[in-house]
Amino acid sequence: ELLSEINR
């Protein structure tokens, strides 16, 4: 979730 947002 957290990394998913950073990787956007």
Swiss-Prot record:
Annotated organism of origin: Pseudotsuga menziesii (Douglas-fir)
Coiled-coil residues: none
Gene Ontology CC annotations of this record: cytoplasm
Keywords: Chaperone, Cytoplasm, Stress response
Name this polypeptide is given: Putative heat shock protein 2
Subunit details: Homodimer.
Keyword set includes Chaperone: yes
Superkingdom of source: Eukaryota
